Swiss-Prot record:
Molecular function as annotated in GO: ATP binding; metal ion binding; protein folding chaperone; protein-folding chaperone binding; unfolded protein binding
Entry's localization field: Cytoplasm
Protein name: Co-chaperonin GroES
Function: Together with the chaperonin GroEL, plays an essential role in assisting protein folding. The GroEL-GroES system forms a nano-cage that allows encapsulation of the non-native substrate proteins and provides a physical environment optimized to promote and accelerate protein folding. GroES binds to the apical surface of the GroEL ring, thereby capping the opening of the GroEL channel.
Superkingdom in the source lineage: Bacteria
GO terms (BP aspect): chaperone cofactor-dependent protein refolding
Quaternary assembly: Heptamer of 7 subunits arranged in a ring. Interacts with the chaperonin GroEL.
A single GO cellular-component term on record: cytoplasm
Main location: cytoplasm
Pfam families given in the database record: Cpn10
Length: 94
């Protein structure tokens, strides 16, 4: 499994929508990039300028919402993931 470093988080990307609410099948270039996923790994956290560790706000298993254009897409062992900085996470779904 991938292990993020620093304040990075690895998110399992939720599948893209294949159809609209009305049932129309979307072409690949018309699909919206997902903005929701499940946290599968969390880094150790960032360090403040005084050297103190800043704890992470998210944990493995959290479902998070993130900005559509943030992070780096990676594929590992056939699965799609997104590597994000914690600051790019907008909310945790409860």
């Amino acid at each position: 499994m991938l292990q993020p470093i620093g304040d990075r988080v690895i998110v399992k990307v939720k599948d893209e929508e294949e159809k609209t609410v009305g049932g129309i099948v979307l072409a690949s270039n018309a699909k919206k990039k997902p903005t929701e996923g499940e946290v599968v790994a969390v880094g150790e956290g960032a360090y403040a300028s005084n050297g103190e560790k800043i704890p992470m706000s998210v944990k493995k298993g959290d479902v998070v919402l993130y900005d559509r254009y943030s992070g780096t897409n990676v594929e590992y062992e056939g699965e799609k993931y997104l590597v994000l900085h914690e600051k790019d996470i907008l909310a945790i779904a409860k």
